Regions:
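Short regulatory helix/loop adjacent to the ATP-binding pocket of P-loop NTPases
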Residues: 108-124, 136-141
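Conserved P-loop NTPase "ATPase switch" module shared by AAA+ and STAND
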Residues: 67-83
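Conserved alpha-helical scaffold flanking the Walker A/P-loop in AAA+ ATPase domains
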Residues: 54-72
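Interdomain hinge/linker elements that couple catalytic modules in large macromolecular machines
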Residues: 132-133, 137-314, 320, 324-326
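A cross-kingdom feature that marks ATP-driven nucleic-acid transaction machinery
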Residues: 1-28, 32-48, 68-70, 249-250, ...
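A short beta-strand-to-loop transition that corresponds to the Sensor-1 phosphate-sensing loop
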Residues: 103-107, 113, 128-130, 388-392
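Conserved catalytic/switch belt of AAA+ P-loop NTPases
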Residues: 84-108, 115-117
């Protein structure tokens, strides 16, 4: 059964006003399936995985565009970068919006080539795995914890018990694993990691020892939901700190991790500056850390980190699926007081705590560390916030903050 992706509306809108559309994202998140469904047979499909097609695109790009005429869907465009300047010449000559739909992995070289060749002509959107809202059939929309949005979401969403939510967290967001068995889960991620090591890692960086990079990948998974410490990560992976920093950028370029930068403001003078790292798919992180089922993960030492990772990525997807750059940050001061998520939207900041509890009553007191941003020339409003938790219902904490059941994300 096809599950409607929230990015569909954004793609149709952008395709109507831009000559080229690029959908990026990690392997196997459904980029091709999404675009082929939207095309409905009305555009030619070619994939650069086909060596004959790729050879033509790389050796005779002009002839390629004579053979495959727009409207055209080109899969894995990063494998044929020489085609991009010819796409530019074609769209400049013909000027039709939506002539080219492209998919590609979110890699350094791809984005650099696209930016150079198609600047001003291309719209770029990013697709990750299924969101909870997509699987549950909820409406699309950027998650901002304001009363109208929360009340609407509470009417359409179910309150998930902790066990059910951790089943979703453990299973992950890959479309191929929707309703899969535990054995399928293990086999899938084993193959996924092997493919990533053999194909993507070699493309993105010079790594001679796949086993060493695998150790790094597992070590990085242990940091999901945590502020990154490159020296400690490097020691655990038995590499140097500069290498750890570079390899983490590789994971980010491949779309496997998201680096959440600290929220910065001139009035906040004592905040840490290191990013936090989140695996974009909690199932992959669980596999790398050998959490063999949801029950063990829920009871394990990293359950809170996995809940935070899941919540942050759900909110991230809610923005990116609307075609917006997610306005996310976090704030932690030198006294270790932390607001897990700060949304900076339309001149207001929305603080969010994330807790594996049903009624974490003291969490909103930490939001006071953000009050200095409401003063001075660059003042921001302190907007609605809340605690994402396992409350039995959407409930107000005070005039501005809410207990937000995790199932409403």
């Amino acid at each position: 059964m096809y599950i409607k992706r929230h990015l569909e509306t954004t793609i149709e809108k952008l395709s109507g006003c831009c000559k080229v559309l690029l959908v990026t994202g990690p392997r196997q998140v459904g980029k091709t399936t999404l675009l082929r469904r939207l095309a409905e047979g009305n555009r030619t499909y070619v994939t650069m995985d086909d060596i004959n097609v790729r050879s033509l695109a790389m050796t005779e790009p002009g002839l390629f565009l004579q053979r495959y005429k727009p409207p055209l869907l080109i899969d894995e465009i990063q494998m044929a970068p020489k085609l991009l300047p010819y796409i530019k010449m074609y769209v400049d000559e013909h000027g039709n919006n939506g002539d080219f739909w492209l998919t590609g992995s979110h890699a350094f070289d791809l984005m650099e080539n696209v930016t150079e060749s198609l600047a001003g002509r291309i719209a770029i959107v990013h697709l990750l795995g299924f969101s909870h809202a997509e699987v549950a059939g909820l409406g699309a929309g950027a998650f901002v914890p304001e009363e109208k949005f929360l009340l609407q979401r509470a009417q359409e969403a179910e309150i998930l018990p902790m066990r059910d939510l951790f089943e979703q967290i453990w299973r992950g967001s890959m479309p191929a694993l929707n309703n899969a068995s535990e054995q399928d889960w293990n086999n899938y991620y084993s193959s996924y990691v092997q493919t990533f090591l053999q194909r993507d890692v070699r493309t993105l960086t010079q790594v001679n020892d796949e086993l060493q990079f695998y150790r790094f990948l597992c070590a990085a998974a242990s940091y999901t939901g945590s502020m990154i410490n490159y020296a400690a990560l490097a020691k655990e992976a038995e590499i140097t700190a500069p290498t750890a920093k570079q390899w983490l950028k590789v994971l980010a370029a491949a779309g496997l991790v998201y680096l959440l930068e600290p929220f910065m403001h001139p009035n906040l003078k004592y905040g840490v500056k290191a990013p936090k790292v989140y695996f974009t798919d909690t199932g992959l992180a669980a596999y790398l850390l050998r959490w063999s089922n949801a029950e063990i993960l829920e009871a394990g030492a990293m359950s809170s980190s996995f809940l935070e990772t899941w919540a942050v990525m759900e909110i991230y997807k809610s923005f990116s699926n609307c075609g917006q750059i997610p306005p996310l940050g976090y704030y932690r001061d030198f006294n270790s007081r932390e607001v897990e998520l700060v949304l900076n939207v339309d001149g207001s900041i929305h603080p969010l705590a994330i807790r594996k509890s049903s009624s974490p009553v003291k969490e909103i007191k930490k939001f006071d560390i953000l009050r200095p941003v409401t003063e001075g020339e660059r003042a921001l409003k302190l907007g609605a916030g809340g605690v994402i938790c396992f409350a039995n219902d959407l409930l107000p904490i005070d005039a501005r903050n809410w207990y937000i059941p995790a199932g409403l994300l």
